[in-house]
């Protein structure tokens, strides 16, 4: 008898306390990049009942109205009344931002931004070291069209749809806080076979019954998403649905649980399908390799899979603070390489095609733009948005050519 292999992943809505904090931190980052693309930003946000605290280190030529950014973000998410636990107009906002340490800055910015046009690109790439040490991972798999693991892809789509039907009124009685989780059964060849369980926990008004909520979510959220994403490729005609398993979920957001930037790093990435170096993304400008190198590693992995060189890939890259060149690059293909191609050849092709120095990553992926607010909910990867440049498969042909020279 074949062993049943079940793999799960979760996502959260934009109204989850930790995700509120991520979105605030990235909204502040975007505002600073909009005024000064070379801003160095490391902003954290914490949340508790009726209160936000924004703190961290910033070096920027611009000025950001932090109070307004916090309130605008909270309002956009949907927290507009103390009745649901948080009011954007009356919540408290404390701000404690200081300048970036000059010792950190000296290893990152050896060329002043005003002089960048006076030096060659190669000089600039060599001059900008990594903003910190660390290990970053990127992953791609051909089990979905967007080359993401199916459990996290479905969980994100369900979370997004849950927020969508709340905002457009398609499902009444919903409030902003919510979580989703999907369990997929895989076959002996590690291909998705069927949906086993869909779990949704969502904040709601007190007058709705759990039975009515369950039926509405199944009709307007679960079934449309499964049909659209899966079609006939993965069975989804007999799965378990769990909605608010503990009962009512009336009080949510920071009124129920404290929130903090960077506490949903597995939700933000691959749902547990790949390793994680531990560094969060939100609130960090692209000089921080926690963010930019993780984006680049996804870009590398996705291009490898899109080129047909492997079915599943994890890319690891590591840096030393103040040093431009990665201290290591490793490509793991889990034995899924294309016929006639070795893992070592793929790794060598990656070194030939991709420049993973921090300044080169920033240039290649155009990361100095104010694009980060929309990354802060529903996943940083697997999104079909032109601003998510790390999702572009623009290196496929170069990889194929590089492999051809190595195989021959």
From Swiss-Prot:
Localization per record = Cytoplasm
Q: What class of enzyme is it?
A: transferase
Q: Which residues bind L-methionine?
A: 57, 100, 257, 288
Q: Which reaction does it catalyse?
A: L-methionine + ATP + H2O = S-adenosyl-L-methionine + phosphate + diphosphate
User: What CDD domains does the record tag this protein with?
Assistant: S-AdoMet_synt
Q: Which Pfam families match?
A: S-AdoMet_synt_C (PF02773), S-AdoMet_synt_M (PF02772), S-AdoMet_synt_N (PF00438)
Tell me the domain of life.
Bacteria
Positions of Mg(2+) binding: 18
Q: Which cofactor does it need?
A: Mg(2+); K(+)
Sequence similarity: Belongs to the AdoMet synthase family.
Name listed for the protein in its UniProt record: S-adenosylmethionine synthase
Which gene underlies this protein?
Answer: metK
């Amino acid at each position: 008898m074949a062993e049943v292999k079940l793999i799960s992943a979760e996502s959260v809505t934009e109204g989850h306390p930790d995700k509120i904090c991520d979105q605030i931190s990235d909204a502040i980052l975007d505002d600073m990049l909009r005024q000064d693309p070379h801003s160095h930003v490391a902003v954290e946000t914490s949340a508790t009942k009726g209160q936000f605290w924004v703190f961290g280190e910033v070096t920027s030529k611009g000025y950001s109205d932090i109070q307004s950014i916090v309130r605008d973000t909270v309002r956009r998410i949907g927290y507009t009344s103390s009745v649901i636990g948080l009011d954007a107009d009356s919540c408290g906002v404390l701000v404690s931002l200081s300048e970036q340490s000059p010792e950190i800055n000296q290893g990152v910015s050896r060329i002043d931004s005003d002089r960048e046009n006076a030096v060659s690109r190669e000089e600039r790439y060599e001059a900008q070291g990594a903003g910190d040490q660390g290990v970053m991972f990127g992953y791609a798999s051909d089990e979905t069209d967007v080359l993401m693991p199916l459990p996290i892809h479905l969980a994100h789509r369900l979370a997004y749809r849950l927020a969508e039907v709340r905002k457009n009124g398609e499902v009444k009685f919903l409030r902003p806080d919510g979580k989703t989780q999907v369990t997929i059964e895989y076959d002996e060849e590690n291909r998705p076979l069927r949906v086993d369980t869909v779990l949704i926990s969502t904040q709601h008004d007190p007058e709705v019954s759990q039975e009515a909520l369950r039926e509405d979510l199944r009709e307007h959220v679960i079934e449309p998403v499964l049909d659209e994403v899966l079609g006939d490729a993965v069975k989804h005609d007999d799965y378990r649905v769990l909605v608010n398993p503990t009962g009512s979920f009336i009080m949510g957001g920071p009124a129920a649980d404290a929130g903090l930037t960077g506490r949903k790093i597995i939700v933000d990435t691959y749902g547990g399908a790949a390793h994680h170096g531990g560094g969060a993304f939100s609130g960090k400008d692209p000089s921080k390799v926690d963010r930019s190198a993780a984006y680049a590693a996804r870009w590398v992995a996705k291009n490898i899979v899109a080129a047909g060189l492997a079915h599943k890939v994890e890319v690891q890259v590591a840096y030393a603070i103040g040093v431009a060149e990665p201290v290591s690059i490793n490509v793991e293909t889990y034995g899924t390489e294309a016929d006639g191609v070795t893992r070592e050849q793929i790794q060598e092709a990656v070194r030939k095609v991709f420049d993973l120095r921090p300044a080169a990553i920033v240039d290649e992926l155009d990361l100095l733009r104010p694009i980060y607010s929309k990354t802060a909910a529903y996943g940083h990867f697997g999104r079909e948005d032109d601003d998510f440049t790390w999702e572009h498969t623009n290196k496929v042909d170069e990889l194929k050519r590089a492999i051809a020279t190595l195989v021959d």
